[in-house]
């Protein structure tokens, strides 16, 4: 493994020497070398170079731990204050007394908020490929509440076990008592907390670009470097992706708060560029974060909630199952597992999971569980690849700086 890493380093040194003797000062040569370095880093993935990837991942982990240890060491007063606060909270949590009823209530709400905020941060913070937690967690939760609300004619699910498990209340509501607004209100906390998490996850690109602009230093971030290149070659942009990025940049720069609000409210993959743009042009923090928070946690979240609730409303689901059954040839065989799944969910809601249909696992549930596991595993693999590529970039930058000093 060490020999593979050494050979990889030697290839980089050879490439650097080939481009030395003044050629690196030429802008086209610099751009070409950056492209080659980027392509070389992109090849450092587990399925192509597993040993080097794991080695670089381990070394990058040690570097990051060392950096954070150094930062915490230079902020000893903050660390000590945090530890004292934590000790006081632990003592309050474990000491018996009349306050325990409030402690339990606060603990329940804190864990609920932390869970959904954490999932929101994972969705947008930019670790690896990003974990699509709306599709994996929040969307299915809203769909489950919607199906249960129409089946029970109520959203007053017993707590506990809600939200871990949904069962119908003893006194079910009248037929037609469920409205779109009642379901929206039921899942408002979870959805808003998830939206707040996604807004928090958009802060790193903003802070990175702002710090780079104030210090005048070039940050160690490819997205920011691409952003600067895009600004330099704005007139020559021809492809759709470049023109879309420029449109987002101009909207945010010229319109300000409402431009950021519009970008945050509409689902789009280019919002990271809005954060970089705001940081680069020194947009005030509360202007950026306020617009992002309102857009993601309120406007965008309600759009997504309404879409899921309407899609999984009772009559729409029944029409979808009927439509599947109408497919020539394979319709009935495809329709059966959907009907079995819906029937099993109804029995669970009415406390009848032990009777009626057999409890063999439905293949729809099995497929979704395996999909969740696969996406989480891919997310972890992407983090390993990303950290390994970060370490490779450190090596390339060190070699480039050594070449410049020769």
Curated annotation (Swiss-Prot):
Topology relative to the lipid bilayer, per the entry, is: Multi-pass membrane protein
Indicate, by first and last residue, each region the UniProt record lists as having compositional bias (Basic and acidic residues). 1-20
What are the start and end residues of every segment in region (Disordered)?
Answer: 1-37
Q: Which residues carry this modification: N-acetylalanine?
A: 2
| Positions on the Cytoplasmic side per record topology | 2-77, 131-250, 295-305, 385-406
| Catalysed reaction equations from the record | a 1,2-diacyl-sn-glycero-3-phospho-L-serine(in) = a 1,2-diacyl-sn-glycero-3-phospho-L-serine(out); cholesterol(in) = cholesterol(out); a 1,2-diacyl-sn-glycero-3-phosphocholine(in) = a 1,2-diacyl-sn-glycero-3-phosphocholine(out); a 1,2-diacyl-sn-glycero-3-phosphoethanolamine(in) = a 1,2-diacyl-sn-glycero-3-phosphoethanolamine(out)
List residues in topological domain: Extracellular. 99-109, 272-273, 327-363
Report the record's Gene Ontology biological process terms: autophagosome assembly; autophagosome membrane docking; autophagy; cell junction assembly; cell-cell adhesion; embryo implantation; lipoprotein transport; mitochondrion-endoplasmic reticulum membrane tethering
Entry domain remark: The VTT domain was previously called the SNARE-assoc domain. As there is no evidence that this domain associates with SNARE proteins, it was renamed as VMP1, TMEM41, and TVP38 (VTT) domain.
Q: What does this protein do?
A: Phospholipid scramblase involved in lipid homeostasis and membrane dynamics processes. Has phospholipid scramblase activity toward cholesterol and phosphatidylserine, as well as phosphatidylethanolamine and phosphatidylcholine. Required for autophagosome formation: participates in early stages of autophagosome biogenesis at the endoplasmic reticulum (ER) membrane by reequilibrating the leaflets of the ER as lipids are extracted by ATG2 (ATG2A or ATG2B) to mediate autophagosome assembly. Regulates ATP2A2 activity to control ER-isolation membrane contacts for autophagosome formation.
Q: Which family does it belong to?
A: Belongs to the VMP1 family.
Q: What is the name listed in the Swiss-Prot or TrEMBL entry for this protein?
A: Vacuole membrane protein 1
Question: Which species is the source of this protein?
Answer: Mus musculus (Mouse)
